[in-house]
Amino acid sequence: MPDRRLSQLLKSKLLRRSSTTATTSPKQNQKPVNAQKKAAVGADPLVDPNSTSDLSCSLPPHLLTSNEGEGDAKSRAYSIISSIPLDHPSSPDEIPGPATGSSAGCEQYFTHFDRSGANSRQEGSQNGSIQQSPTFTRTLRHKQLTEEKDKGKLQSREGDQRGEYGYQRIRNDSNDSDPQYSLTTELANKPSTPQTPAGDDSLHSPSATPLPLSPSLPGPTGASSLQAAYRPVRENSSVPLVESQLTPSLGAVAEDSSGESAFHFVGPSSSSPFPKRPPLGFRRQSLLPASHQHLISGLLGFGPSQNLGQGSGHPSTVNADMIPRKVWVKRPGGSATLVPTMEDSLVDELRDQVIMKYANSLGRTFDSPDIMIRISPREGSNRQSTPERILSPEEPLGVVLDTYFPGGQTVDEALVIDIPQRRTPKPSPRHPVYYHHSEPGEHGEYFPLMPANPNAPTPPTHPSASSTSVNAHHTGPSISILTTDSNMASCPQPPVAAPQVPTPPGPPPESPQTKTHTPPARVASPRPRPTKPKKAGNGQSPNAAFGGLIEGTVPPINVLIVEDNIINQKLLEAFMKRLSVRWKCAANGEEAVRKWREGGFHLVLMDIQLPVMNGLDATKEIRRLERLNGIGVFTKTASGRSSASSLSPEVNQASSEVSLSEEDTLHDLSLFKSPVIIVALTASSLQSDRHEALAAGCNDFLTKPVGFPWLEQKVTEWGCMQALIDFEGWRKWRGFADEPQSSSPTDGGFTSPLQAGANGVSSRTSTSPSSAAVNATARAFATGPGAGKRKSTVPELTKPVDILPEEPPGSGSGEGNETLDSPASPLTSVHVGDPTEPPGDEEQQALDAT
């Protein structure tokens, strides 16, 4: 029996080898078999020692016929492999030893898998050969012989088999239930399914599981090794896990060709002609099933029209009330415009849209609740059902429009936007602008600090008439005295117009001008006025010399500019040039004091922040020197005279050597007619800085930057004040110094030498009560008793009597030095003449002095 079976097996082996292409395992190394296997080989080394009697059972020929259908072939091939377990062992002698896994099982597995070689194998089976069971294995010797013979064929066929196997394995993993897969896919799926206990039982069945392992037993049979090798591949498609599963469970069979085939053949799937199914992330296109796709379309659509073509039959997800609607609106008398709203919007929401539409005209002034929407019915409609009215904010706009305008609203039927009639914010901004324009400008900042603030408007009236301009300049700076003069000047004008002059003896023609200034005891201010008529006759040439001035009102004053900034210094110099005014510059306070000591300055523009010595210190030093040298209104000596004016030049110098140091002495007092006017210039506008500057001795406080119009007015104002003080210098400048003086003094009156004019003949004689009063007052002081008492009570009237004889000719009048509480006119001293002289000589002497 065993011999017969061995011969049949050998014959079938030889027939199979001749009819089919031998496929061998890619493994080159195989562990040596045990001694039982070598003994079982016996004399015939070509016989497979692992074959058993139960494995050599003949299979019915109809199982391997080529005319079977493909489905039957697959099922029967699967049944062949699944029925491989050893069910019919004939005798113990026929089992030489436990079956060991080899490449035969894997080879037969690939034989069923290989579609290209399926026909050749089926032909071999039809010729009467018995197909070898997958559980047969080869010995190491037989394997080496086969590898030596078929080495060339192995290399060519090995790649094809691996590629096809890898492709089938990948497709099998991607979809296990696909009926299109081949028989080998089913073979790999069934035994390796981990969910069914049958798969596990097949692995451990008596037929598939080897006998108890011994050191000589290398591993399980071919079928079980195949299942054990491919099961981890199905469960985990990672190569390291395949090796870790094979190594501990199979021992020596860990290098079995089945496991290695799975390891090598999964890789080259990229070059497979079979397309790989896309992953799950790419196949999933929606979160909802196909039956709910209409929801996605409804959400993404803008209207119900887009959902009509889907054919799903589901209603649209967009409500008809959400459709936008446009309404015609307009302002009274304006053009209509469209405003977007919703179908279910209220009138209040329409007002919000109107504010956004009229962002400039309405949005800047009104809020949406402030406006009202008025609707007018359509022409020809029932006025009772649809009257013209103001829409309420809570009314639905769509319903109202459909009620008033069935069929749609036209442009002519636009809603009217009504706004409140009176808005207080509108006029309020205009008033500040109006008042701002009416402000006098920079003059308002400085004149309020002066007591003569009411006289500030008089400077603009200067250009009106030359005589009044000088008078106005007189009144502006003269503060207390000139304020009364100006008030009295306006009152006496009507009496002056009346020719009641015959009573006074010979009033000079100055009296008409004194009519404008008729101070009873202060006729000094009227005296300059008589010179104005001559200025009208001869003053054209001096005015031509100062072409840029306003009728020559700015006198030839000398200005000292104290500024450390070269740019500001040049600007002020340019202003002085335009005004035709002489000037000098100083870069610091010390230099300013040094130049002031030279004399001849009428105005000082003093910057506060200066190097070496600041402006306030320089101002204090100038005021100190003026006080020590008796310039201006200062304390009197024991005799009641001014410290500066009561002494002759010789006596003055002698006393200065005793009381004053050389540094504090001013050598030529004739150049200092009055205290110089100091104007503080600073970039600070703080009130504290203003007070500090005024306390230091400044006459005015001005803020930078300085404009030319302001500077021109200021120079005119302060220059005219100095012209009144230095009347002699101003008179020379006006051309009166060379006039012939014809005086015919009589007891009854005086003929003014200034009235002679250019012809040298008195043009007119006029008398005024003011001049008569002045003369009477002078005579009363001259001849009346109590001359000593007069000196004590009215000390200011006695000083000019002593000064006039001592004043050197041509040095200018020192009248400004005799004022006690205000800069009095230099002519005040004229009326208090020498009592020994006749009145005519006194008047003439006064005129000569001026």
From Swiss-Prot:
InterPro entries: CheY-like_superfamily, Sig_transdc_resp-reg_receiver
SUPFAM superfamilies xrefs: CheY-like (SSF52172)
Pfam families recorded: Response_reg
Subcellular location: Cytoplasm
Extent of Low complexity compositional bias: 7-25, 762-782
Keywords for the protein's UniProt record, in alphabetical order: Cytoplasm, Phosphoprotein, Stress response, Two-component regulatory system, Virulence
GO biological process: osmosensory signaling via phosphorelay pathway
Biased composition (Acidic residues): 839-850
Region annotated Disordered, chain positions: 1-225, 419-542, 736-850
Single GO molecular function: phosphorelay response regulator activity
Ranges of biased composition (kind: Pro residues): 492-511
Sequence ranges assigned to domain Response regulatory in this UniProt record: 558-719
One GO CC term on file: cytoplasm
Biased composition (Polar residues): 117-138, 177-196, 477-490, 819-828
UniProt entry tagged with the keyword Cytoplasm: yes
SMART domains named in the record: REC
PTM-bearing positions, type 4-aspartylphosphate: 607
Disruption phenotype: Leads to increased germination that induces more inflammation in host lungs. Decreased ability to induce the sakA-dependent stress pathway. Leads to sensitivity to oxidative stress and heat stress.
Main location, first listed in the record: cytoplasm
Function: Final receptor of the osmolarity two-component system regulatory system, which controls activity of the sakA mitogen-activated protein kinase (MAPK) pathway in response to changes in the osmolarity of the extracellular environment. Regulates the germination in the airways that drives enhanced disease initiation and inflammation in the lungs.
Name listed for the protein in its UniProt record: Response regulator sskA
